[in-house]
Regions:
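Metal-dependent nuclease catalytic regions and adjoining charged, substrate-binding loops involved
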Residues: 148-150, 162-263, 443-549
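Polyanion-engaging groove/track-forming segments
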Residues: 2-66, 73-74, 160-165, 183, ...
Length: 549
């Protein structure tokens, strides 16, 4: 929502974005996106044509689909039409609380100059004003349901402040140039509203409704210092945002591992690959693009199976325990006993699965990585590990459950839950490709000092026991198998620029089937659920599926 993205995790990247004139010393060849990657871009274009050009909804949809570049995936086209029709369901006043509001072109920009430096603050969204201009409204978007999550206070305060005090300005062309605000005319702004629209269900929520004085006070208390600090930057923190960073070639904190994926082709546009992305692509290219690149929302009536909820709940409990400081080993008393339903965060574990999950957690005690906490030098819960394969121009991202360091080196820890007791038809790396990615990343030394003696621990929890395993990334056979698996998953994904749907069995568990024109419905409604033992946890619990803008 704010012009300065407050949600990104890398201070250096945020600062670089806050300075449009900053550019890399060495520019690589231009690589155009084959498909639209900003899901709300077509939506904004269609609304612009309806509100400012007088097009009908259908005319606007057809014009944008025909002329916007890069083109949208068919699934994004479905989502765009759904969101547009919901947004414009009441054309005269779709979201406002009382009086009619009228669309405003351009942006509301607060601009100042100090020590020769131009400072600009603005917020992204759709802008509206009352007939006399005394009331302004900024409408922002959430992919899912409006009001379902709280936005950062600094973000909301910035939106309210720029809506209250910003001057109209067109988008700079080129972007490195400053805005050229025009002093507003007419009555002074007296009232400001920030309204959130939910694209999935056409819901709306008023996030702020107050005077300009209240907006100024909120900005001074909760945003001014935050924005100043973000613009100053800080130490780089490589993560999932690296692919879009304009100073990536100058970043010393990002590990570079040419050949990590076994692909010698850097001609494609830079993208990000994780084990979950690779698995989603192998299931269906369209599913991967719609869910993990565009982050389109899941239907409201989609549901997780009890097994999936159980697995997520077990992981959430262990994550909280392993984050405690000082480090202490897990004890039976830390866990629910399973005699009744229980919950952790968003996960409600009920019935038989409440007892199954409790038994799994109880068996974790015997294999807890902090049994000898005094020997642990460092630990990080669910860190984001990233490396740049420059030979393929791909950011490889992983998120282990836990990494910790002892006297031997770094340990990459993964926990799995299952009730499966049947025969094994796959190796551990084949069954869990994220372990294959872990092998290659550890062999490349991406964790820094302590990587030489690194190992991977896998903890499989069942109701009747824990099954620990250990993998040595330095073992030649293990490394060869990991490379075969990773390259086999990465090659087709890397080569594919169209993400054509592959309807079939994958439709049954597809989280974005609502948007896919090629979706094949299951035989019964109960068939369309998310099962745990066959679906990666990272794919299930992807918070970006309800992203806010």
């Amino acid at each position: 929502m704010a012009g300065l993205d407050l949600l990104q995790s890398c201070p250096a990247q945020i600062a670089a974005k806050a300075h449009p004139e900053v550019s890399p010393r060495v520019r690589g060849p231009f690589k155009g996106q084959p498909l639209e990657t900003f899901a709300l871009g077509p939506l904004m274009d269609v609304l612009n044509r309806v509100e400012f050009e007088g097009d009908s909804i259908q005319q606007a949809l057809e014009t944008v689909a025909q002329h916007r570049r890069p083109p949208s995936h068919p699934g994004l086209g479905t989502f765009t039409e759904h969101a547009v029709r919901g947004y414009l369901a009441n054309p005269s006043n779709p979201l406002s609380c009382d009086e009619p509001m009228y669309p405003v072109r351009g942006f509301w920009v607060c601009r100042g100059k100090k020590d020769g430096v131009v400072r600009e603050t603005w917020a992204w969204g759709r802008r509206y004003r009352s007939q006399d201009g005394a009331v302004r409204e900024l409408r922002v978007f959430r992919f899912g349901t409006a009001g379902s999550r709280t936005r950062p206070p600094a973000e909301l305060a910035t939106a309210a402040y720029t809506t209250a005090f910003g001057s109209p300005a067109a988008w700079p062309d080129p972007w490195r140039e400053p805005f050229d605000p025009v002093p507003p005319s007419g009555p002074a702004v007296r009232r400001v509203r920030i309204v959130e629209f939910g694209c999935l269900d056409s819901s709306r929520a008023v996030l702020f409704d107050g005077t300009v004085e209240e907006a100024a006070a909120m900005y001074a208390a909760g945003a001014q210092d935050v924005l100043r600090q973000r613009a100053l930057g800080g130490a780089p923190n490589p993560g999932s945002d690296c692919a879009d960073c304009k100073i990536i070639t100058a970043c010393d904190a990002l590990p570079r591992v040419p050949g990590l994926l076994g692909i010698a082709d850097s001609s494609k546009v830079r993208r990000t690959l994780s084990a979950a992305t690779a698995k989603a692509y192998a299931s269906c290219p369209a599913q991967e693009h719609l869910s993990r690149t565009l982050h389109l929302p899941r239907p409201l009536d989609s549901e997780y199976s009890p097994k999936a909820i159980r697995g997520q709940a077990v992981h959430a409990v262990l994550e909280a325990n392993h984050a405690r400081m000082p480090r202490v080993p897990c004890q039976i008393g830390d866990f629910p006993d399973g005699s009744q339903d229980w919950s952790v965060g968003r996960w409600q574990v009920r019935g038989d699965q409440a007892l199954v999950a409790a038994r799994m957690l109880a068996h974790h005690v015997a294999v807890c990585p902090f049994r000898h906490a005094n020997q642990v030098i460092d630990s990080r819960v669910e860190p984001v590990i990233v490396a740049h394969d420059t030979a393929a121009d791909v950011l490889v991202v992983a998120k282990p459950d836990l990494i910790y360091r002892d006297s031997e080196g770094w340990v990459w820890r993964e926990t799995k839950t299952t009730q499966w007791y049947g025969p094994k038809t796959m190796t551990l790396l084949e069954e869990h490709p994220q372990l294959a990615f872990a092998v290659l990343l550890l062999r490349a030394g991406v964790l820094g000092p302590g990587s030489a003696g690194a190992r991977i621990e896998v903890e499989v929890l069942r109701p009747d026991g824990a099954d620990p395993s250990c993998l040595d990334p330095a073992d030649p056979e293990t490394a060869a198998e990991a490379q075969r698996i990773v390259t086999g998953l990465a090659e087709p994904w890397h080569a594919d620029m169209r993400s054509i749907a592959r309807p079939g069995e994958s439709c049954r568990t597809c989280p974005v089937s609502q948007w896919c024109p090629d979706y094949v419905p299951p035989r019964t409604n109960s068939d369309h659920i998310f099962d745990a033992d066959g679906v990666d946890e990272e794919l299930l619990d992807d918070p970006q599926n309800d992203d806010a803008w």
